[in-house]
Amino acid sequence: MKIFQNTKNVIVSIAWAAALCTSAVSAQTLTSNSTGTNNGFYYTFWKDSGDASMTLLSGGRYQSSWNSSTNNWVGGKGWNPGSSSRVISYSGYYGVDSSQNSYLALYGWTRSPLIEYYVIESYGSYNPASCSGGTDYGSFQSDGATYNVRRCQRVNQPSIDGNQTFYQYFSVRNPKKGFGNISGTITFANHANFWATKGLNLGNHNYQVLATEGYQSRGSSDITVSQGGSSGGGNSSSSSSASGGGSKIIVVRARGTAGGESITLRVGNTNVATWTLTTTMTNYTATTSASGGSLVQYTNDSGNRDVQVDYISVNGSIRQSEDQTYNTGVYQNGSCGGGNGRSEWLHCNGAIGYGDI
Protein backbone atom coordinates (compact mmCIF):
# COMPACT_ATOMS: atom_id res chain seq x y z
CA MET A 1 0.00 0.00 0.00
CA LYS A 2 2.99 2.26 0.22
CA ILE A 3 5.31 3.80 -2.37
CA PHE A 4 8.29 5.81 -1.24
CA GLN A 5 9.67 8.07 -3.98
CA ASN A 6 8.59 11.54 -5.09
CA THR A 7 7.69 12.51 -8.67
CA LYS A 8 6.16 15.70 -9.99
CA ASN A 9 5.75 15.76 -13.78
CA VAL A 10 2.30 16.11 -15.32
CA ILE A 11 0.79 13.87 -18.00
CA VAL A 12 -2.34 14.31 -20.02
CA SER A 13 -4.40 11.16 -20.50
CA ILE A 14 -6.41 11.49 -23.69
CA ALA A 15 -8.00 8.11 -23.17
CA TRP A 16 -9.17 9.08 -19.69
CA ALA A 17 -10.74 12.29 -20.98
CA ALA A 18 -12.54 10.33 -23.66
CA ALA A 19 -13.79 7.84 -21.10
CA LEU A 20 -15.28 10.64 -19.03
CA CYS A 21 -17.46 11.57 -21.99
CA THR A 22 -19.23 8.21 -21.80
CA SER A 23 -21.39 7.91 -18.72
CA ALA A 24 -22.43 4.56 -17.26
CA VAL A 25 -25.80 4.23 -15.55
CA SER A 26 -24.33 2.05 -12.81
CA ALA A 27 -21.22 4.16 -12.24
CA GLN A 28 -20.34 4.97 -8.63
CA THR A 29 -17.48 7.40 -7.95
CA LEU A 30 -15.52 7.05 -4.71
CA THR A 31 -13.62 9.97 -3.21
CA SER A 32 -13.23 8.69 0.36
CA ASN A 33 -11.88 5.41 1.71
CA SER A 34 -14.25 2.54 1.02
CA THR A 35 -14.50 -1.23 0.52
CA GLY A 36 -17.41 -3.38 -0.64
CA THR A 37 -18.85 -5.24 -3.60
CA ASN A 38 -19.95 -3.89 -6.97
CA ASN A 39 -21.39 -5.84 -9.90
CA GLY A 40 -20.10 -9.12 -8.53
CA PHE A 41 -16.57 -7.92 -7.70
CA TYR A 42 -14.95 -6.80 -4.47
CA TYR A 43 -13.44 -3.32 -4.50
CA THR A 44 -11.14 -1.32 -2.28
CA PHE A 45 -10.24 2.36 -2.39
CA TRP A 46 -7.79 3.98 0.03
CA LYS A 47 -5.95 7.30 0.11
CA ASP A 48 -4.22 9.32 2.78
CA SER A 49 -4.97 12.75 1.27
CA GLY A 50 -5.80 14.66 -1.88
CA ASP A 51 -8.11 14.37 -4.87
CA ALA A 52 -7.70 10.74 -5.95
CA SER A 53 -10.96 9.13 -7.05
CA MET A 54 -12.12 5.77 -8.38
CA THR A 55 -15.26 5.08 -10.41
CA LEU A 56 -16.87 1.62 -10.25
CA LEU A 57 -18.29 0.45 -13.58
CA SER A 58 -19.87 -2.75 -14.88
CA GLY A 59 -18.36 -6.13 -14.06
CA GLY A 60 -14.69 -5.98 -13.15
CA ARG A 61 -14.11 -2.55 -14.66
CA TYR A 62 -13.03 0.57 -12.80
CA GLN A 63 -11.54 3.95 -13.67
CA SER A 64 -9.24 6.07 -11.53
CA SER A 65 -7.77 9.56 -11.59
CA TRP A 66 -5.33 11.30 -9.27
CA ASN A 67 -3.01 14.29 -9.14
CA SER A 68 -0.06 15.44 -7.07
CA SER A 69 -2.32 16.69 -4.26
CA THR A 70 -2.61 13.03 -3.27
CA ASN A 71 0.29 11.70 -1.23
CA ASN A 72 -0.50 7.97 -1.58
CA TRP A 73 -3.53 6.10 -2.87
CA VAL A 74 -4.42 2.58 -4.04
CA GLY A 75 -7.60 1.02 -5.38
CA GLY A 76 -8.93 -1.70 -7.60
CA LYS A 77 -11.42 -4.50 -8.20
CA GLY A 78 -11.10 -8.23 -7.60
CA TRP A 79 -12.15 -10.74 -4.96
CA ASN A 80 -12.51 -11.29 -1.23
CA PRO A 81 -11.20 -13.72 -0.21
CA GLY A 82 -8.25 -13.97 -2.53
CA SER A 83 -6.82 -17.28 -3.71
CA SER A 84 -3.32 -18.65 -4.24
CA SER A 85 -4.55 -20.60 -7.28
CA ARG A 86 -6.41 -17.85 -9.15
CA VAL A 87 -5.53 -16.96 -12.76
CA ILE A 88 -6.21 -13.25 -13.35
CA SER A 89 -6.68 -11.53 -16.70
CA TYR A 90 -6.74 -7.76 -17.12
CA SER A 91 -6.99 -5.22 -19.92
CA GLY A 92 -7.57 -1.50 -20.39
CA TYR A 93 -5.56 1.70 -20.13
CA TYR A 94 -2.76 2.67 -17.72
CA GLY A 95 -2.32 6.43 -18.05
CA VAL A 96 1.07 7.23 -16.56
CA ASP A 97 4.60 7.57 -17.94
CA SER A 98 8.12 6.82 -16.74
CA SER A 99 8.29 10.05 -14.72
CA GLN A 100 5.29 9.15 -12.54
CA ASN A 101 5.55 7.10 -9.34
CA SER A 102 2.84 4.50 -9.82
CA TYR A 103 2.21 0.75 -10.03
CA LEU A 104 -0.28 -1.47 -11.83
CA ALA A 105 -0.33 -4.73 -9.89
CA LEU A 106 -2.16 -7.68 -8.48
CA TYR A 107 -2.40 -6.58 -4.87
CA GLY A 108 -3.61 -8.34 -1.75
CA TRP A 109 -3.32 -9.16 1.92
CA THR A 110 -3.24 -12.26 4.11
CA ARG A 111 -3.51 -12.76 7.86
CA SER A 112 -1.55 -15.21 10.04
CA PRO A 113 0.93 -14.08 8.91
CA LEU A 114 -0.01 -10.51 8.06
CA ILE A 115 1.42 -10.08 4.55
CA GLU A 116 0.95 -7.38 1.91
CA TYR A 117 1.83 -8.69 -1.56
CA TYR A 118 2.23 -7.30 -5.06
CA VAL A 119 2.68 -8.82 -8.50
CA ILE A 120 3.89 -5.71 -10.30
CA GLU A 121 2.98 -5.69 -14.01
CA SER A 122 3.99 -2.09 -14.79
CA TYR A 123 5.48 0.82 -12.89
CA GLY A 124 6.71 4.33 -13.51
CA SER A 125 9.68 6.12 -11.99
CA TYR A 126 10.27 3.85 -8.99
CA ASN A 127 11.07 0.15 -9.18
CA PRO A 128 9.78 -1.47 -5.99
CA ALA A 129 12.53 -4.09 -6.25
CA SER A 130 14.87 -1.36 -4.97
CA CYS A 131 13.03 -0.90 -1.67
CA SER A 132 15.42 0.07 1.12
CA GLY A 133 16.57 -2.69 3.44
CA GLY A 134 14.88 -5.44 1.45
CA THR A 135 16.08 -8.95 0.67
CA ASP A 136 16.28 -10.40 -2.84
CA TYR A 137 15.08 -13.96 -3.40
CA GLY A 138 15.98 -14.52 -7.04
CA SER A 139 13.69 -14.77 -10.03
CA PHE A 140 11.44 -17.19 -11.92
CA GLN A 141 9.53 -17.42 -15.19
CA SER A 142 5.76 -16.98 -15.47
CA ASP A 143 3.32 -15.86 -18.17
CA GLY A 144 6.05 -15.11 -20.68
CA ALA A 145 8.25 -12.95 -18.46
CA THR A 146 10.82 -13.05 -15.67
CA TYR A 147 9.68 -11.93 -12.21
CA ASN A 148 12.23 -10.64 -9.69
CA VAL A 149 11.28 -11.33 -6.07
CA ARG A 150 12.04 -9.12 -3.08
CA ARG A 151 10.81 -8.92 0.51
CA CYS A 152 10.59 -5.66 2.47
CA GLN A 153 9.51 -4.90 6.01
CA ARG A 154 7.09 -2.15 7.04
CA VAL A 155 7.27 -0.94 10.64
CA ASN A 156 4.20 0.54 12.34
CA GLN A 157 2.51 1.32 9.02
CA PRO A 158 -1.14 1.14 7.87
CA SER A 159 -2.49 -2.34 7.16
CA ILE A 160 -5.84 -4.13 7.04
CA ASP A 161 -5.48 -4.41 10.84
CA GLY A 162 -4.51 -0.81 11.57
CA ASN A 163 -0.91 0.26 12.05
CA GLN A 164 1.24 -2.87 12.24
CA THR A 165 4.70 -4.22 11.45
CA PHE A 166 4.58 -6.69 8.56
CA TYR A 167 6.38 -7.98 5.48
CA GLN A 168 5.69 -7.09 1.86
CA TYR A 169 6.34 -9.60 -0.94
CA PHE A 170 7.05 -8.25 -4.43
CA SER A 171 7.18 -10.07 -7.76
CA VAL A 172 8.26 -7.46 -10.33
CA ARG A 173 7.76 -8.23 -14.02
CA ASN A 174 10.79 -7.96 -16.31
CA PRO A 175 10.26 -6.62 -18.87
CA LYS A 176 7.55 -4.52 -17.32
CA LYS A 177 4.41 -3.87 -19.32
CA GLY A 178 4.27 -0.54 -21.13
CA PHE A 179 2.01 2.44 -20.56
CA GLY A 180 -1.22 3.32 -22.36
CA ASN A 181 -3.22 0.36 -23.65
CA ILE A 182 -2.32 -2.67 -21.57
CA SER A 183 -3.39 -6.27 -21.01
CA GLY A 184 -2.03 -9.44 -19.48
CA THR A 185 -2.49 -12.61 -17.47
CA ILE A 186 -1.18 -13.41 -13.99
CA THR A 187 -0.98 -17.07 -12.92
CA PHE A 188 -0.79 -16.33 -9.22
CA ALA A 189 -0.04 -19.93 -8.21
CA ASN A 190 3.38 -19.56 -9.84
CA HIS A 191 4.14 -16.63 -7.56
CA ALA A 192 2.76 -18.16 -4.37
CA ASN A 193 4.62 -21.42 -5.02
CA PHE A 194 7.95 -19.72 -5.73
CA TRP A 195 7.59 -17.51 -2.68
CA ALA A 196 6.91 -20.59 -0.55
CA THR A 197 10.12 -22.28 -1.74
CA LYS A 198 11.98 -19.27 -0.33
CA GLY A 199 10.12 -19.36 2.99
CA LEU A 200 7.88 -16.44 2.00
CA ASN A 201 4.62 -17.98 3.09
CA LEU A 202 1.16 -16.51 2.71
CA GLY A 203 -1.53 -16.79 5.35
CA ASN A 204 -5.32 -16.76 5.18
CA HIS A 205 -6.38 -14.65 2.23
CA ASN A 206 -8.16 -11.34 2.67
CA TYR A 207 -8.85 -9.31 -0.48
CA GLN A 208 -7.04 -9.66 -3.83
CA VAL A 209 -7.50 -6.97 -6.49
CA LEU A 210 -5.96 -5.74 -9.74
CA ALA A 211 -4.92 -2.36 -8.38
CA THR A 212 -3.67 1.00 -9.53
CA GLU A 213 -1.47 2.85 -7.03
CA GLY A 214 0.12 6.29 -7.05
CA TYR A 215 2.47 8.25 -4.82
CA GLN A 216 2.91 12.03 -5.18
CA SER A 217 2.22 11.69 -8.88
CA ARG A 218 -0.47 12.22 -11.48
CA GLY A 219 -2.28 9.80 -13.77
CA SER A 220 -5.34 7.75 -14.60
CA SER A 221 -6.39 4.20 -15.35
CA ASP A 222 -9.31 2.33 -16.92
CA ILE A 223 -8.93 -1.35 -16.04
CA THR A 224 -11.12 -4.44 -16.42
CA VAL A 225 -10.23 -7.54 -14.42
CA SER A 226 -11.57 -11.08 -14.77
CA GLN A 227 -10.80 -14.54 -13.49
CA GLY A 228 -8.97 -16.82 -15.90
CA GLY A 229 -8.38 -16.26 -19.61
CA SER A 230 -11.38 -16.07 -21.89
CA SER A 231 -11.47 -18.41 -24.87
CA GLY A 232 -13.17 -18.38 -28.22
CA GLY A 233 -15.14 -15.28 -29.10
CA GLY A 234 -15.49 -13.57 -32.46
CA ASN A 235 -15.80 -15.45 -35.73
CA SER A 236 -13.12 -17.93 -36.71
CA SER A 237 -12.28 -20.23 -39.57
CA SER A 238 -9.53 -22.84 -39.82
CA SER A 239 -7.92 -24.14 -42.98
CA SER A 240 -8.19 -27.82 -43.82
CA SER A 241 -4.42 -28.18 -43.66
CA ALA A 242 -4.51 -27.17 -40.00
CA SER A 243 -7.12 -29.68 -38.94
CA GLY A 244 -6.92 -33.35 -38.17
CA GLY A 245 -5.45 -33.59 -34.69
CA GLY A 246 -2.19 -31.66 -34.99
CA SER A 247 0.39 -31.75 -32.22
CA LYS A 248 0.59 -28.05 -31.36
CA ILE A 249 -2.04 -25.99 -29.56
CA ILE A 250 -1.54 -22.31 -30.35
CA VAL A 251 -3.39 -19.54 -28.52
CA VAL A 252 -3.42 -15.99 -29.93
CA ARG A 253 -4.57 -13.37 -27.42
CA ALA A 254 -5.79 -10.31 -29.32
CA ARG A 255 -8.41 -7.61 -29.76
CA GLY A 256 -9.39 -4.94 -32.26
CA THR A 257 -9.94 -1.28 -31.48
CA ALA A 258 -13.08 -1.01 -33.61
CA GLY A 259 -14.22 -4.62 -34.02
CA GLY A 260 -14.24 -6.50 -37.29
CA GLU A 261 -10.46 -6.57 -37.70
CA SER A 262 -9.22 -9.79 -39.33
CA ILE A 263 -6.07 -11.64 -38.32
CA THR A 264 -4.54 -14.84 -39.66
CA LEU A 265 -2.21 -17.21 -37.83
CA ARG A 266 0.45 -18.58 -40.22
CA VAL A 267 2.96 -21.34 -39.50
CA GLY A 268 5.49 -22.05 -42.23
CA ASN A 269 3.55 -21.55 -45.46
CA THR A 270 0.25 -22.65 -43.90
CA ASN A 271 -2.68 -20.43 -43.01
CA VAL A 272 -3.66 -22.15 -39.77
CA ALA A 273 -6.65 -20.03 -38.74
CA THR A 274 -8.34 -16.70 -39.44
CA TRP A 275 -10.35 -14.83 -36.83
CA THR A 276 -12.53 -11.73 -36.84
CA LEU A 277 -11.79 -9.74 -33.68
CA THR A 278 -14.04 -8.06 -31.17
CA THR A 279 -12.96 -5.13 -29.00
CA THR A 280 -12.52 -7.44 -25.98
CA MET A 281 -9.12 -9.03 -25.39
CA THR A 282 -9.81 -12.68 -26.19
CA ASN A 283 -7.92 -15.97 -26.47
CA TYR A 284 -8.27 -17.52 -29.95
CA THR A 285 -7.18 -21.17 -30.16
CA ALA A 286 -6.02 -23.33 -33.08
CA THR A 287 -4.44 -26.77 -33.38
CA THR A 288 -1.90 -27.60 -36.07
CA SER A 289 0.83 -30.03 -37.06
CA ALA A 290 2.51 -27.39 -39.25
CA SER A 291 6.03 -26.26 -38.36
CA GLY A 292 8.33 -23.40 -39.29
CA GLY A 293 8.21 -19.66 -38.75
CA SER A 294 5.08 -18.36 -37.01
CA LEU A 295 3.37 -15.02 -37.39
CA VAL A 296 0.07 -13.24 -36.80
CA GLN A 297 -0.96 -11.20 -39.84
CA TYR A 298 -3.42 -8.27 -39.92
CA THR A 299 -5.15 -8.06 -43.30
CA ASN A 300 -8.03 -5.55 -43.41
CA ASP A 301 -6.76 -2.23 -42.08
CA SER A 302 -9.05 0.75 -42.70
CA GLY A 303 -10.37 3.83 -40.92
CA ASN A 304 -9.90 3.63 -37.16
CA ARG A 305 -9.06 -0.07 -37.07
CA ASP A 306 -5.99 -1.30 -35.20
CA VAL A 307 -5.05 -4.68 -33.73
CA GLN A 308 -3.45 -5.38 -30.35
CA VAL A 309 -1.85 -8.83 -29.95
CA ASP A 310 -0.87 -9.47 -26.34
CA TYR A 311 0.95 -12.75 -26.99
CA ILE A 312 0.80 -16.17 -28.57
CA SER A 313 1.34 -19.38 -26.64
CA VAL A 314 2.57 -22.65 -28.12
CA ASN A 315 1.59 -25.68 -26.03
CA GLY A 316 1.39 -23.37 -23.03
CA SER A 317 4.69 -21.52 -23.59
CA ILE A 318 3.98 -17.79 -23.98
CA ARG A 319 5.77 -15.51 -26.47
CA GLN A 320 5.03 -11.85 -25.70
CA SER A 321 4.51 -9.53 -28.67
CA GLU A 322 6.61 -6.75 -27.18
CA ASP A 323 9.61 -9.12 -27.08
CA GLN A 324 9.52 -9.74 -30.86
CA THR A 325 11.69 -7.69 -33.24
CA TYR A 326 9.74 -8.61 -36.41
CA ASN A 327 6.70 -6.33 -36.72
CA THR A 328 5.79 -4.87 -40.11
CA GLY A 329 2.47 -3.40 -38.98
CA VAL A 330 3.39 -1.14 -36.06
CA TYR A 331 3.70 2.57 -36.92
CA GLN A 332 7.16 3.67 -35.77
CA ASN A 333 9.55 6.41 -36.91
CA GLY A 334 7.02 7.80 -39.36
CA SER A 335 6.16 4.60 -41.22
CA CYS A 336 4.60 1.17 -40.84
CA GLY A 337 7.29 -1.26 -39.72
CA GLY A 338 9.78 1.59 -39.50
CA GLY A 339 11.19 0.79 -36.08
CA ASN A 340 12.56 -2.14 -34.10
CA GLY A 341 9.23 -3.91 -33.54
CA ARG A 342 8.82 -4.77 -29.86
CA SER A 343 5.18 -3.74 -29.79
CA GLU A 344 1.79 -5.37 -29.29
CA TRP A 345 0.28 -3.14 -31.97
CA LEU A 346 -0.52 -3.56 -35.66
CA HIS A 347 -1.62 -0.14 -36.94
CA CYS A 348 -1.31 -1.13 -40.61
CA ASN A 349 -1.65 -4.32 -42.63
CA GLY A 350 1.36 -6.35 -41.57
CA ALA A 351 2.49 -9.09 -39.22
CA ILE A 352 4.26 -9.87 -35.96
CA GLY A 353 6.72 -12.78 -36.17
CA TYR A 354 7.10 -15.13 -33.21
CA GLY A 355 9.92 -17.40 -34.39
CA ASP A 356 9.96 -21.07 -35.31
CA ILE A 357 7.61 -23.62 -33.79
UniProtKB/Swiss-Prot annotation:
GO biological process terms on file: xylan catabolic process
Source taxon at top rank: Bacteria
This protein's record includes keyword Cell inner membrane: no
Gene Ontology terms for molecular function: endo-1,4-beta-xylanase activity
Entry's family note: Belongs to the glycosyl hydrolase 11 (cellulase G) family.
PANTHER family: ENDO-1,4-BETA-XYLANASE A-RELATED (PTHR46828:SF2)
Name assigned to this protein: Endo-1,4-beta-xylanase Xyn11B
Lineage: Bacteria, Pseudomonadati, Pseudomonadota, Gammaproteobacteria, Cellvibrionales
